[in-house]
């Protein structure tokens, strides 16, 4: 088996977890108490959904997941919510005082008291796996627990499970709206710490999703539940190939191989289509060509940036539902002729394609329409450097005046960690810039002609 352990850290991570597991349960026909009426092979653990669920002797399915937050309120909602019987009580770990939006509290002061408890729980989950493939880590960059504790945990996971891949689904601070003033600080500190510990990080920004909910789903005032359900669909598409049999299956390590050209450049952009409300879907049936084309619209992306200004290094298209390879080939050919998609010149313009015959499922009564086919595009583009540049600019404005720095120093950090993190991000921006520069310019011409 190629099992996958999900780790949900902090409020954002836990709430994304709620949406994801709600959707997985619907997709696999698992009831909120973990029973699965359709499962004929009770106790036999070779079904493909067992990558995400363990099966007990009595036929109960338990998620391979750990929920961690340094304050109790959000996890208490899981403990008393509709899925309270689904999770093992020891998988829900909450502390007494929160990280107060402070990376240093999450990473040093409070985080260090909980990290061993969490690792112990993860170890128990890992022991139940026959061939653990890796970890999916859900968190936000802006919060104290999501930034501080998650980075501490990832450092420790690298030590204990060195070879296992770690993929992140991370909420990136939105350009305009922020939940806290110090989000930029937390984000650069955590990015700096986890850059070498994460293999691939799918960033999502709340504002981009907020706009999608307003524009495509006609939700006038989207709540976090609306946002998380949309994120759930994306995560479900990314993990569908691990949970279902399919024609072209893609596993975790395959994502990295195809999306990450250099270890540091591991922040793919995610786009999902079709995102339409039930009223609209009633009148239109979207073809493979239309949903593929929609993926290249900046408006459908999960991070605010413009790929038309950047170059693509790699591109994965994950289809699910009623899709045949012939249509996909035609759609991609069409996109290549119509759109101005520019690939870096050192990379072949190939698209990695995955097809899963399981149609997309939606949560009943939610905003998204039930459709027969959907696609999730993961692309590594140099345009995402715009997002880093925006963040760095905000940090510079605050750090020039040393605003809010005393909160971090008071929790045991040193001021030089800020400048180190800022330098590392400057290097990251430069890395993206260099990757996009054409290699065959200037003096390389003679060598380029040899081939």
From Swiss-Prot:
Pfam families hit by this protein: Tubulin, Tubulin_C
Keywords: Acetylation, Cytoplasm, Cytoskeleton, GTP-binding, Hydrolase, Magnesium, Metal-binding, Microtubule, Nucleotide-binding
Name of protein: Tubulin alpha-2 chain
Cofactor(s) recorded in Swiss-Prot or TrEMBL: Mg(2+)
UniProt xrefs under InterPro entries: Alpha_tubulin (IPR002452), Tub_FtsZ_C (IPR008280), Tubulin (IPR000217), Tubulin/FtsZ-like_C (IPR037103), Tubulin/FtsZ_2-layer-sand-dom (IPR018316), Tubulin/FtsZ_GTPase_sf (IPR036525), Tubulin_C (IPR023123), Tubulin_CS (IPR017975)
UniProt record similarity statement: Belongs to the tubulin family.
EC number: 3.6.5.-
Modification N6-acetyllysine occurs at: 40
Species, as recorded: Homarus americanus (American lobster)
Signal sequence, start to end: none
GO cellular component, one term: cytoplasm
Role description: Tubulin is the major constituent of microtubules, a cylinder consisting of laterally associated linear protofilaments composed of alpha- and beta-tubulin heterodimers. Microtubules grow by the addition of GTP-tubulin dimers to the microtubule end, where a stabilizing cap forms. Below the cap, tubulin dimers are in GDP-bound state, owing to GTPase activity of alpha-tubulin.
Subunit structure: Dimer of alpha and beta chains. A typical microtubule is a hollow water-filled tube with an outer diameter of 25 nm and an inner diameter of 15 nM. Alpha-beta heterodimers associate head-to-tail to form protofilaments running lengthwise along the microtubule wall with the beta-tubulin subunit facing the microtubule plus end conferring a structural polarity. Microtubules usually have 13 protofilaments but different protofilament numbers can be found in some organisms and specialized cells.
Compartment annotation: Cytoplasm, Cytoskeleton
Binding-site residues for GTP, renumbered to this chain: 11, 71, 140, 144-145, 179, 206, 228
GO molecular function, one term: metal ion binding
Biological processes, Gene Ontology terms: microtubule-based process
Chain sites annotated for binding Mg(2+): 71
Family matches, as SMART domains: Tubulin, Tubulin_C
UniProt region (Disordered), positions on chain: 432-451
Catalytic activity line of the entry: GTP + H2O = GDP + phosphate + H(+)
Post-translational modification: Undergoes a tyrosination/detyrosination cycle, the cyclic removal and re-addition of a C-terminal tyrosine residue by the enzymes tubulin tyrosine carboxypeptidase (TTCP) and tubulin tyrosine ligase (TTL), respectively.
Active site residues per record: 254
UniProt-listed PROSITE patterns: TUBULIN (PS00227)
